[in-house]
Amino acid sequence: MNVKDMLRQASDAAKQLITLSDQTIIGILKETAQVLRTHTEEVLAANRQDLERMDPANPKYDRLKLTEERLQGIAADMENVSTLPSPLNKVLSETIRPNGMVIRKVTVPFGVIGVIYEARPNVTFDVFSLCFRSGNACVLKGGSDADFSNRALVRIIHSVLERQGINPAVCTLLPPDREATAELLGAVGLVDLIIPRGSSSLIHFVREHAKVPVIETGAGICHTYFDRSGDKGKGREIVNNAKTRRVSVCNALDCLIIHRERLSDLPYICEKLPDSNVIIYADEPAYAALSEHYPETLLQQANENSFGTEFLDYKMSIRTVSSLDEVLSHIARYSSKHSESIISEDPETIRRFQQLVDAACVYANVSTAFTDGAQFGFGAEIGISTQKLHARGPMALPELTTYKYIIEGDGQTRI
């Protein structure tokens, strides 16, 4: 079957979803999670085939790798999504016009959502659970790196759908080639929305070539500013957590900005980073402050390319500033508008930072690692939107709906 026919089938299958009861949707999600638990070894075997084709030193390796613990977490996330309130048929507003006509603004599914992602097999289940719960069919375009894993996961989803009499095309996995990507991006009339999840180069490619509406997600160039009034204890813990908790995710710290007056505390703030072999690219003042305290093999002089880079690795840059205005200027120039944090004890500085930094998530005395749908209480997320239209920040169930107007009357005609 060619890709165009697969997309037509997904579009047709989406119409069946509208008629499903909430109880049916919840039951299918719970059953799918349970089947995943009983087929863990099958999925791990497929994942091992993918891992064998990738260098363990590749930053994508950690994202690609599935473990029994991670699969248990994926199943739990799906069960959690099943417990969330349905985002559909919510009356957003209701007005009665002078002529007696009633107008209701009601949430509805998009229809078919295409998601393009790289070496992240966990996204397969996250996308299906969120799309299915919100009444949308999903078209999955995973990367070739994760093809064995994705196919194993979709087989589990299809087995449950078929057993329940649901058209399995509501979860369609496209071939992992570039031609399929091109077909998806041009599928006007068959696909209602495309969400890319991955590197900045992937997102740029989708933005440049898509004819279908796109919500950009994923790329995170994240900064943390240690202010003149910052608590160094908080700074040490936050910087270490934001950088080393999981380097391959989009909310990981890429650049520490530090006020010049606090350079003497920089060795303490960076004290835990050598435990994870974090390579630091420091500007001249920061390099001088660290040179006798940080391992020589892990400390390098920064250049212009050190800033504005999403490392996705045990690497980070450090920039020294003399004022909040310099901080704001640096972030405005290099940020991907994902997650930015300030460590400060001065309420006015925090207020200005929160007000003037243009990002989806702006933190004060908190690690950027919390930019996550589950951590925000949304359940699993389909991605972190870095744009402003329709959705911004972690995208969960409400962001996967649009609305329509329902108008009722009693024979009214317009003069």
Swiss-Prot record:
List the Gene3D superfamilies hit by this protein, alphabetically. Aldehyde Dehydrogenase, Chain A, domain 1, Aldehyde Dehydrogenase, Chain A, domain 2
Task: Could you list this entry's UniProt keywords, alphabetically sorted.
Answer: Amino-acid biosynthesis, Cytoplasm, NADP, Oxidoreductase, Proline biosynthesis
User: What reaction does this enzyme carry out catalytically?
Assistant: L-glutamate 5-semialdehyde + phosphate + NADP(+) = L-glutamyl 5-phosphate + NADPH + H(+)
Where, subcellularly, is it found? Cytoplasm
Q: Name the enzyme's class.
A: oxidoreductase
Q: Please provide one cellular component term from the Gene Ontology annotations of this protein.
A: cytoplasm
* Position of the signal peptide: none
Give its E.C. classification number.
1.2.1.41
Q: Which GO terms describe its biological process?
A: L-proline biosynthetic process
InterPro entries (alphabetical): Ald_DH/histidinol_DH, Ald_DH_C, Ald_DH_N, Glu-5-SA_DH, GPR_dom
Question: Can you tell which superkingdom this protein's organism belongs to?
Answer: Bacteria
Q: CDD domains from the entry?
A: ALDH_F18-19_ProA-GPR (cd07079)
Is ATP-binding a UniProt keyword of this protein? no
Asked if the record carries the keyword Cell inner membrane, the reply is no
Pathway per the UniProt entry: Amino-acid biosynthesis; L-proline biosynthesis; L-glutamate 5-semialdehyde from L-glutamate: step 2/2
- Kindly list the GO molecular function terms attached to this UniProt entry: glutamate-5-semialdehyde dehydrogenase activity; NADP binding
Task: Give the protein's biological function.
Answer: Catalyzes the NADPH-dependent reduction of L-glutamate 5-phosphate into L-glutamate 5-semialdehyde and phosphate. The product spontaneously undergoes cyclization to form 1-pyrroline-5-carboxylate.
The UniProt family comment states:
Belongs to the gamma-glutamyl phosphate reductase family.
Q: Which HAMAP family match?
A: ProA
Q: What is this protein called?
A: Gamma-glutamyl phosphate reductase
Q: Which organism is it from?
A: Parabacteroides distasonis (strain ATCC 8503 / DSM 20701 / CIP 104284 / JCM 5825 / NCTC 11152)
Q: Which gene encodes it?
A: proA
